[in-house]
Swiss-Prot record:
ATP binds at residues 20, 48-50, 68, 91, 139-141. One of its GO terms (cellular component) is cytoplasm. Its EC number is 2.7.9.3. Homodimer. It comes from Actinobacillus pleuropneumoniae serotype 5b (strain L20). Synthesizes selenophosphate from selenide and ATP. This is Selenide, water dikinase.
Length: 347
């Protein structure tokens, strides 16, 4: 009798970026009674919820440093490693930089799962690093109750091309490079609702590395860029709005989702992270339908890049995406701040 295949998602209580601590709780954790340490060379810290830290080392060069890790969102070990690595690498591209090396972060239940499973996870991470043109140069591992994997990534960026949450401008158009609904599809799979024709849809999107960010960063008219992950589209957009003192309009009719997402929402395949996200920033958003909330607050894992583009550069950005065979979905626009209106208006 053949052994049952190992299903990694059965060994964790959370999945992918849905494991992230909610924005509200994270805000409490990051409060400090200590005087702020001022370093004039630290160009980007954690004040504006950016994707990575950036340090000026001189001669117009910034060093990017970031880390990201989570529990399995798929059952296959190799795919889990690929997705976790792609997700971590994305932070560097979202800042407008290029990665130069990575080290692995591995937590593994050595008494529950064979070492060969961990080997496949790391191999998946190594594969993604090679796709990004860098080495997986080392790492650290611990014995943990649940599988955890991710990377700490180092990158470089021109200090004049850093894309910050605080640099967006009113009048910019908003674009996203991947469809939404990853959290919904992975939840549908856990619930046994996923149709055969929708298998691997989410996996394939999560494995795509956001290499295109390095090209977008060359354009001064791309004023801000971030990746959409565990806080959902509205959560990460709210970080841009708050950091840049602007507000946003999101056109729900223009939002692209993975096939089947709306049907699975109707069947109750909404991850717990969706409500945690809404509880954290829902007061900043205009009224939405339940379906809109389930899509726009859906926690993404290795999601797309959200970019703010001045109108005169929209055609150029679309051309870059087309040449790279990357989808580019218009999702809304940025407007002048107005304290009498919601930070983000969903229409």
């Amino acid at each position: 009798m053949a052994e049952e295949p190992i299903r990694l998602t059965q060994y964790s209580h959370g999945a992918g970026u849905g494991c992230k601590i909610s924005p509200k709780v994270l805000g409490t954790i990051l409060q400090s009674q200590l005087d702020k340490f001022i370093d004039p060379n630290l160009l980007v810290g954690n004040e504006t919820a950016d994707d990575a830290a950036v340090y000026d080392i001189g001669n117009g060069i910034g060093i990017i440093s970031t880390t990201d890790f989570f529990m399995p969102i798929v059952d296959d070990p190799f795919d889990f490693g690929r997705i976790a690595a792609a997700n971590a690498l994305s932070d560097v591209f979202a800042m407008g930089g290029k990665p130069i090396m990575a080290i692995a972060i591995l937590g593994f239940p050595v008494n529950k799962l064979p070492a060969e499973v961990a080997q496949k996870i790391v191999e998946g991470g190594r594969f993604a690093c090679q796709q990004a043109g860098i080495a997986l140069a080392g790492g650290h591992s611990i014995d943990s109750p649940e599988p955890i994997f991710g990377l700490a990534v180092t990158g470089t960026v021109s200090t004049e091309q850093v894309k910050k949450n605080a640099s967006a401008q009113a009048g910019c158009e908003l674009f996203l490079t991947k469809p939404l609904g990853i959290g919904v599809l992975t939840t549908a799979e856990k619930k046994g609702l996923l149709k055969v024709e929708h298998q691997n849809l989410a996996r394939d999107v999560m494995c795509q590395i956001n290499l295109i960010g390095a090209q977008f960063s060359q354009l001064a008219d791309v004023t801000a860029m971030t990746d959409v992950t565990g806080f959902g589209l509205l959560g990460h957009l709210s970080e841009i709005c708050q950091g840049s003192n602007v507000r946003a309009e999101v056109n729900s009719a223009e939002i692209h989702t993975l096939d089947g997402v709306k049907d699975y929402i109707a069947q109750g395949a909404v991850p717990g992270g969706t409500n945690r996200n809404f509880d954290s920033y829902g007061h900043l958003i205009s009224a939405m339908s339940d379906e809109q909330k389930a899509i726009l607050c859906d926690p993404q894992t290795s999601g797309g890049l959200l970019i703010a583009v001045r109108p005169q550069a929209v055609e150029k950005v679309q051309q870059i995406a087309k040449q790279a065979n990357i989808p580019l979905f218009r999702v809304g626009r940025l407007l002048e701040a107005d304290t009498m209106k919601p930070l983000i208006e969903v229409i």
